UniProtKB/Swiss-Prot annotation:
Top-rank taxon, per record: Eukaryota
Glycan attachment points: 318
Post-translational modification: During host cell invasion, proteolytically cleaved at the cell membrane in the region I by a papain-like cysteine protease of parasite origin. Cleavage is triggered by the sporozoite contact with highly sulfated heparan sulfate proteoglycans (HSPGs) present on the host hepatocyte cell surface. Cleavage exposes the TSP type-1 (TSR) domain and is required for productive invasion of host hepatocytes but not for adhesion to the host cell membrane. Cleavage is dispensable for sporozoite development in the oocyst, motility and for traversal of host and vector cells. O-glycosylated; maybe by POFUT2.
Organism: Plasmodium vivax (strain Salvador I)
Gene Ontology cellular-component terms listed: cell surface; cytoplasm; plasma membrane; side of membrane
Sequence repeat segments: 95-103, 104-112, 113-121, 122-130, 131-139, 140-148, 149-157, 158-166, 167-175, 176-184, 185-193, 194-202, 203-211, 212-220, 221-229, 230-238, 239-247, 248-256, 257-265, 266-274
Similarity comment text for this entry: Belongs to the plasmodium circumsporozoite protein family.
Entry note about domains: The N-terminus is involved in the initial binding to heparan sulfate proteoglycans (HSPGs) on the surface of host hepatocytes. The N-terminus masks the TSP type-1 (TSR) domain which maintains the sporozoites in a migratory state, enabling them to complete their journey to the salivary gland in the mosquito vector and then to the host liver. The unmasking of the TSP type-1 (TSR) domain when the sporozoite interacts with the host hepatocyte also protects sporozoites from host antibodies.
Region (Required for the binding to heparan sulfate proteoglycans (HSPGs) on the surface of host hepatocytes): 80-88
Protein's gene: CSP
Disulfide pairings: 315-349, 319-354
Pfam families membership: TSP_1 (PF00090)
Region of interest called Disordered, as start-end residue ranges on this chain: 51-294
Taxonomic lineage: Eukaryota, Sar, Alveolata, Apicomplexa, Aconoidasida
Protein name per Swiss-Prot or TrEMBL: Circumsporozoite protein
C-alpha cells in the first residue's frame, strides 16, 4: 500500500512538470487558438474543385444556357437546331458614356473623353481646345480669356480672380495670391507671398513680422506664442500648448507635452506623475492605476543610471509588472549623475506571469521530497 501511494504521488508530480501537456496547467487561450487555427485552415480548394466537378456533371459549364436542359427532348425529336431568343453578347461595352463614335466620351461629339466639348477631346464647355472649362481659345481654361487653365483670370493661365498674373486668387499683380496685394500666394497678406493675415512676411497667419505665424509676434508658425515659432499659447518656447517654458506642453508647467500635468510630461491632470489620467500618485482610473510608481522608478534609475540612454532599458523585473525608462531628447547629452525623473520617460512593462516559475520550483521540490521518502523508508 505504501509503495502504491508513493507511485501515485510521483506520477502526479511528474505529470505536473509538463504543464503544456496536462489538464490543470493547460493554457486555455492557446488551446482555443489552436482549435481555431485547425478549423480555419481547412483547404477550400478541394471544396471548390468538387463544386466545379458537380457543376460540370450537371451540364452547367460557363457559357451554357440553363434552358437547354428542358429543351433537350424537343431538340432530339424535331432534329432541328433551336435558336436562342436572346443571343448572348460576349463583347464588353465600350466606356463611352453618351459619346457618339468615340470611347469614353461624355456628351462629346467626335472626340474621346470630351465633356460637352465641340471638336476636341476632354473639353468641358471649351471652344476649339482640349480640356477647356468655359475657356475661349485655350485649353483647360476655366472662365479665362486667352490663356489656359485660367479661373476667372484675365490674360494669364490658372488665375483665379487675378489681374495680370497666373494662378492668382484675388491677388493684384502676382501669381497664386489669395487676397494678397503685391505678392504671390498671399492670403490677406500685405507685401509678402503666402501670408494669411500676415504683415510683411510670407505664410503668416495673423503674424506680425514673421512667416507662417498664427497669432504669433516675432516668430514664424507661432500660434498665440510670444517670441518662439509654432507655439500654441506658449510663452518662450516653440509648439507649446498652454505650456510655460517648455515646447509642446498642453497645460503643463515646466515640461513638454504635458496635458494638465505639473512637473511631468504627457500627464493628464496628474500631479507628480507622468501620463497619469486624473490621478494623483496612484490614481483611480485605468491610466492612473497603470502609472509607474515614483519610488520604484527612482530605485530602478539608481541601478541603470550609468547605462540609460535614449532607447528603452530592459524591464525592471523578470516576471510580472515592472517599469522601463529612457532619456528624453533634451536630456540626451546630460551626465548620468545629473539625471532626474524629469529627464526620463517611463513606461509600464509586463513580463510573463510568475506562476509558471513557481509551479516548476514547487514540483521539483516535491519530487525531491518524494525521492528522499522513497529511499529512506
Amino acid at each position: 500500500m505504501k509503495n502504491f501511494i508513493l507511485l501515485a504521488v510521483s506520477s502526479i508530480l511528474l505529470v505536473d512538470l509538463f504543464p503544456t501537456h496536462c489538464g490543470h496547467n493547460v493554457d486555455l487561450s492557446k488551446a482555443i487558438n489552436l482549435n481555431g487555427v485547425n478549423f480555419n485552415n481547412v483547404d477550400a480548394s478541394s471544396l471548390g474543385a468538387a463544386h466545379v466537378g458537380q457543376s460540370a456533371s450537371r451540364g452547367r459549364g460557363l457559357g451554357e444556357n440553363p434552358d437547354d436542359e428542358e429543351g433537350d427532348a424537343k431538340k432530339k425529336k424535331d432534329g432541328k437546331k433551336a435558336e436562342p431568343k436572346n443571343p448572348r453578347e460576349n463583347k464588353l461595352k465600350q466606356p463611352g458614356d453618351r459619346a457618339d463614335g468615340q470611347p469614353a466620351g461624355d456628351r462629346a461629339d467626335g472626340q474621346p473623353a470630351g465633356d460637352r466639348a465641340d471638336g476636341q477631346p476632354a473639353g468641358d464647355r471649351a471652344d476649339g481646345q482640349p480640356a477647356g472649362d468655359r475657356a475661349a481659345g485655350q485649353p483647360a481654361g476655366d472662365r479665362a480669356d486667352g490663356q489656359p487653365a485660367g479661373d476667372r483670370a484675365d490674360g494669364q493661365p490658372a488665375g483665379d480672380r487675378a489681374d495680370g498674373q497666373p494662378a492668382g486668387d484675388r491677388a493684384d499683380g502676382q501669381p497664386a495670391g489669395d487676397r494678397a496685394a503685391g505678392q504671390p500666394a498671399g492670403d490677406r497678406a500685405a507685401g509678402q507671398p503666402a501670408g494669411d493675415r500676415a504683415d510683411g512676411q510670407p505664410a503668416g497667419d495673423r503674424a506680425a513680422g514673421q512667416p507662417a505665424g498664427d497669432r504669433a509676434d516675432g516668430q514664424p508658425a507661432g500660434d498665440r506664442a510670444a517670441g518662439q515659432p509654432a507655439g500654441d499659447r506658449a510663452d518662450g518656447q516653440p509648439a507649446g500648448d498652454r505650456a510655460a517654458g517648455q515646447p509642446a506642453g498642453d497645460r503643463a508647467a515646466g515640461q513638454p507635452a504635458g496635458d494638465r500635468a505639473a512637473g511631468q510630461a504627457a500627464g493628464d491632470r496628474a500631479a507628480g506623475q507622468a501620463a497619469g489620467g486624473n490621478a494623483g500618485g496612484q490614481g483611480q482610473n485605468n491610466e492612473g492605476a497603470n502609472a509607474p510608481n515614483e519610488k520604484s522608478v527612482k530605485e530602478y534609475l539608481d541601478k541603470v543610471r550609468a547605462t540609460v540612454g535614449t532607447e528603452w532599458t530592459p524591464c525592471s523585473v523578470t516576471c510580472g509588472v515592472g517599469v522601463r525608462v529612457r532619456r528624453r531628447v533634451n536630456a540626451a547629452n546630460k551626465k548620468p549623475e545629473d539625471l532626474t525623473l524629469n529627464d526620463l520617460e517611463t513606461d509600464v512593462c509586463t513580463m510573463d506571469k510568475c506562476a509558471g516559475i513557481f509551479n516548476v520550483v514547487s514540483n521539483s521540490l516535491g519530487l525531491v521530497i518524494l525521492l528522499v521518502l522513497a529511499l529512506f523508508n
